[in-house]
C-alpha cells in the first residue's frame, strides 16, 4: 500500500454539520494522507503525524528504515479514520526514506516517509524588518502566467473574468514573470495574499478559506512552483512573506466531512458568528461572554473557527507553519485575523516558530 498522491489529494469536504462518529463507515485501513508531508533532522519542533485513512485507528504502527527515528506513542481520535503518531527523531538520525509500518493481525502495509537534512543556515535565516519596502499583491488579480491552470478538474470554482468576485486567472507563474517589475519599483519584500488551496464554490480568489494546509491551490500552481517562486524572489533581492490563517479553515477543507475530534472546530447548535470585538483579546476586564464569542464564533459562514485549545489542533498548526518555512525557505509570516485566535495557544504557536527560527518575524496585523 502506498500513500496516494503523496498526501496531496483533492479536497472533498464541503459540510458544516456536527461530526457524528456513528455515520462513518469502518473500512480496512487505506492510508490516504500523512501530514506533515515530510520532516527534517535537527528540528526543535516535536513531530506528530496526522494519519488519515478508513479504519486506521485500529492499526498498530512502527517505523522502519534506519536508526534514530521511531514511534513514541499513538493516539486515537473521536473518528476511527484518524491516528496521531508521535515520532522521535533523534539528534543522530540519518536523512532518508523511512517507512510507517501499519499492522492489524496478519494484515500489514507500509507508507514511505521522508526525513530530509535541513538546508545550511536554515535556523539563522534573516527576516523582514521595518527597513523593508513590502509589495502586497493578490495573486489571482496580479498576472496570469499559465492559462492552462485557470480552472482545474478537482477544484469547484472555475475562472470567470466577468465575475467581480470570481477567479480571474492570476498565478505563481505570473508572479515569477514579474519579479523584475516588483524589484524595479524598489521593493525589498513581497507579500502575496494566501496561496494555499481555497476550495469554496464562490469567492475563492482571495484564499482566506483554506481547504488544505499543505497544498498550494492548483489554480496558482504547485508546492514545487511556490518554492521556485521563493528562490527566484531571493535572486531578485526580495524577501517572501507568506500570508497564513490560523483562526479558521474553509468549509471546503478536506476534513470537514469527517473531523478528527468533535472539538476540532468550534461548533454551535446553529450558526454563530464572531462579535468582531477583537479588543476583548487584549482587555483584562472583558466579559467572558464577549471574549468567548470573539474567539469561538465563526468569522463568516464559510470559515469554520479552529479550536486551538485542542492540543492536537495546536500541534498540527505549529507543524504546518514550520513545514512551510523549512520547505519553501520563507522569510516571514503575515498572520491573518490574529486577534480572533485563542490568546494562550497562539502565544505557544508564536514561541514554537521563534524557537525553530529565532530571527523569524511574524506580522500580526489585521486588515
Question: Which role does the model predict for each range below?
Answer:
Residues 43-106:
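Immunoglobulin-like IPT/TIG beta-sandwich domains and homologous Ig-like subdomains
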Residues 142-322, 327, 346-361:
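Substrate-binding/active-site clefts of carbohydrate-active enzymes
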Residues 241, 332-338:
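Short catalytic-loop micro-motif centered on adjacent basic/acidic residues
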Amino acid at each position: 500500500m502506498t500513500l496516494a498522491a503523496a498526501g496531496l489529494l483533492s479536497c472533498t469536504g464541503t459540510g458544516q454539520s456536527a461530526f457524528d462518529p456513528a455515520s462513518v463507515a469502518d473500512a480496512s485501513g487505506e492510508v490516504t494522507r500523512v501530514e506533515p508531508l515530510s520532516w527534517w533532522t535537527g528540528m526543535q519542533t516535536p513531530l506528530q503525524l496526522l494519519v488519515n485513512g478508513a479504519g486506521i485507528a485500529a492499526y498498530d504502527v512502527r517505523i522502519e528504515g534506519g536508526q534514530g527515528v521511531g514511534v513514541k506513542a499513538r493516539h486515537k481520535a473521536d473518528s476511527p479514520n484518524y491516528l496521531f503518531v508521535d515520532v522521535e527523531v533523534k539528534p543522530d538520525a540519518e536523512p532518508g526514506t523511512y517507512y510507517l509500518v501499519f499492522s492489524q493481525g496478519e494484515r500489514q502495509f507500509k507508507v514511505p516517509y521522508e526525513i530530509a537534512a535541513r538546508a545550511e543556515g536554515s535556523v539563522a535565516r534573516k527576516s523582514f524588518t521595518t527597513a523593508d519596502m513590502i509589495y502586497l499583491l493578490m495573486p489571482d488579480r496580479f498576472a496570469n502566467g499559465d492559462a492552462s491552470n485557470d480552472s482545474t478538474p478537482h477544484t469547484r470554482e472555475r475562472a470567470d473574468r466577468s465575475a467581480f468576485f470570481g477567479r480571474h486567472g492570476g498565478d505563481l507563474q505570473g508572479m515569477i514573470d514579474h519579479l523584475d517589475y516588483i524589484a524595479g519599483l524598489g521593493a525589498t519584500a513581497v507579500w502575496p495574499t494566501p496561496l494555499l488551496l481555497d476550495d469554496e464554490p464562490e469567492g475563492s480568489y482571495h484564499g482566506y478559506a483554506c481547504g488544505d494546509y499543505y497544498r498550494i491551490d492548483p489554480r496558482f500552481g504547485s508546492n514545487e512552483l511556490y518554492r521556485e517562486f521563493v528562490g527566484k524572489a531571493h535572486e531578485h533581492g526580495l524577501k517572501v512573506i507568506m500570508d497564513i490563517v490560523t483562526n479558521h479553515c474553509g468549509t471546503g477543507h478536506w476534513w470537514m466531512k469527517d473531523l478528527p475530534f468533535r472539538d476540532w472546530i468550534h461548533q454551535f447548535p446553529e450558526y454563530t458568528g464572531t462579535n468582531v470585538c477583537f479588543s476583548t483579546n487584549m482587555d483584562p476586564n472583558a466579559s467572558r461572554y464577549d471574549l468567548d464569542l470573539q474567539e469561538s464564533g465563526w468569522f463568516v459562514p464559510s470559515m469554520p473557527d479552529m479550536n486551538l485549545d485542542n492540543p492536537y489542533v495546536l500541534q498540527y498548526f505549529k507543524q504546518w507553519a514550520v513545514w512551510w518555512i523549512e520547505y519553501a525557505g520563507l522569510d516571514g509570516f503575515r498572520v491573518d485575523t490574529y486577534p480572533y485566535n485563542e490568546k494562550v495557544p497562539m502565544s505557544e504557536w508564536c514561541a514554537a516558530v521563534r524557537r525553530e527560527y529565532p530571527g523569524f518575524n511574524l506580522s500580526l496585523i489585521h486588515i
